[in-house]
From Swiss-Prot:
Keywords: Cytoplasm, DNA-binding, Endonuclease, Hydrolase, Nuclease. GO terms for cellular component: cytoplasm. This is Endonuclease NucS. It is found in: Cytoplasm. It is an enzyme of class 3 (hydrolase). Cleaves both 3' and 5' ssDNA extremities of branched DNA structures. It comes from Arthrobacter sp. (strain FB24).
Length: 231
């Protein structure tokens, strides 16, 4: 992991265009090829980023940029699309690299991990014709619990929680923003699934076009035998 604090401007060029004017920012260059641009606000969400696979090329700026104070130019090129992240660095304030090694990954709450496994095996609970793409679909901002396809072949990102609240909806929203930038997956819609979903979370999910599904954990485990009940 390389961490650079620099005065820089940033341009995203491709299917979308975005510009960040000159300011001091944190640049994260990860071993998987992803590059993320952070400010001192906005919580953990980057201002802009390039997802892996991608390549980073550092070059000397042209005469025009040199006159504007640019000392070096980073071009982060996506390997899948023509999208590029262009970072014009005016001054480096800090530059350090650390070998983090293999990360064991997020260890989920026991019930959440079991819900993920069970839903992957019973993906048809989300609707007729659903099929599993994979569990733990990794992105530059974290793993999507389950990626699936619906009966129409459209991509669906599923976020699983034991108790669904607003934070879970916000997390899924960030995943959807990122996944919909990938032409191989887009359009991607979201499903927020949990044993219990708070009313505020349902309202926010509905406002953002995200479906909510309440999961019966006991039934999924096969222990909810209604025929054996006395009452």
């Amino acid at each position: 992991m390389r961490l650079v604090i620099a005065r820089c401007s940033v341009d995203y060029v491709g299917r979308l265009k975005a510009h960040l004017p000159l300011a001091t920012r944190l640049l994260l260059v990860k071993a998987d090829g992803s590059v993320l641009v952070h400010s001192d606000g906005g919580s953990y969400k980057p201002l802009n980023w390039m997802s892996p696979p991608a390549s980073l090329r550092v070059s000397t700026p042209d005469e025009v940029d040199l006159e504007l104070g640019v000392t070096e130019q980073w071009t982060v090129q996506s390997a899948k699309t023509d999208d590029r992240l262009i970072i014009n660095i005016h001054e480096q304030l800090h530059d350090t690299s650390h070998e983090l090694g293999q990360d064991p990954g997020l260890i989920k709450d026991g019930v959440e991990a079991d819900l993920q496994r069970l839903l992957a095996d019973q993906i048809e609970r989300l609707g007729t014709g659903f099929s599993l793409i994979r569990r733990e679909y990794f992105t530059a901002i974290g793993p999507v619990d389950i990626l699936a396809r619906d009966a129409d072949g459209a991509t669906v990102a599923i976020e699983l929680k034991r108790r669904g609240d607003i934070d879970g909806v916000e997390q899924l929203t960030r995943y959807l923003e990122l996944l919909n930038r990938d032409p191989l997956l887009a359009p991607v819609r979201g499903i927020f699934a949990a044993q219990q979903i708070k009313p505020q979370a349902k309202v926010l999910a509905n406002d953002r076009g995200i479906d909510c599904v309440t999961l019966d954990y006991d039934a999924m485990r096969g222990v909810d035998d209604s025929e054996s009940r006395l009452f």
